[in-house]
Amino acid sequence: MKKISLLLMLSCVLSLQAQLRNNDVYEVTEMEQSRVRREIRIPNVDDYKVLKCDFHTHTVFSDGKVWPDTRVMEAWQEGLDAVAITDHIEYLPHKEIIKADLNESYKIAKKAADASGFIVIKGTEITRSKPLGHLNALFINDVMPMDVEDPLKAIDEAVRQGAFIMWNHPGWPDDKSTFYPVHEELIKAGKIHGLEVFNHMEYYPACFDWAM
């Protein structure tokens, strides 16, 4: 008798579920993008709280392939605490399709991040061929004044805005990590503050030694 009652209840539940389904549209929630976050545990140092951040990212507003809010979601899923949006100033391969102010990608990312309490850093990438190469300007206020022909003037504007300036991927694109005189001059002038030793799938051992 108990088995019959149990089967009857199960049949009723299945019937009810079938009735609740919309025959026109049924949402398959299992297909939603994962909201699982990977945990990266790094201990704090003395009284300083350690945050995990990606300081070099691009979106469709320069040569990236995703919308800015997707960069925020990716960073959160990877276990980071913050992400910098650093679209190129000069290299805009999608500019015929995406026409916007150079600050727009940050605005979109910031709106998405605020909804989840995530940190987004405003930045940009000053993009030139070697010997100068590419430099990220982080913690800036406005990208537009850096859109100038002379890259040294762009760097000066970034410094004026209180930026942290990072020399990006010194070993790219020629597979040679070369410390040029222009970098020595900028470092002595206090206009380069950091060095990227790993980018995408490349590690630059010589640059690690320079940084140390």
Which residues are covered by each model-predicted region?
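Positively charged n-region of N-terminal signal peptides that target proteins for export
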Residues: M1-I4
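A periodicity- and composition-biased signal for non-globular, repetitive helical segments
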Residues: L8-M9, G64
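Hydrophobic h-region of N-terminal signal peptides that target proteins for export
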Residues: M9-Q17
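Generic secondary-structure boundary signal with a strong preference for alpha-helix termini
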Residues: L14-S15, P68, D174
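Cleaved targeting-peptide boundary
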Residues: Q19-Y26
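A metal-dependent hydrolase metal-coordination microenvironment
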Residues: E32-Q161, N168, S177, P181-V182, ...
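Extracellular glycoside hydrolase catalytic/binding regions
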Residues: P170-W172
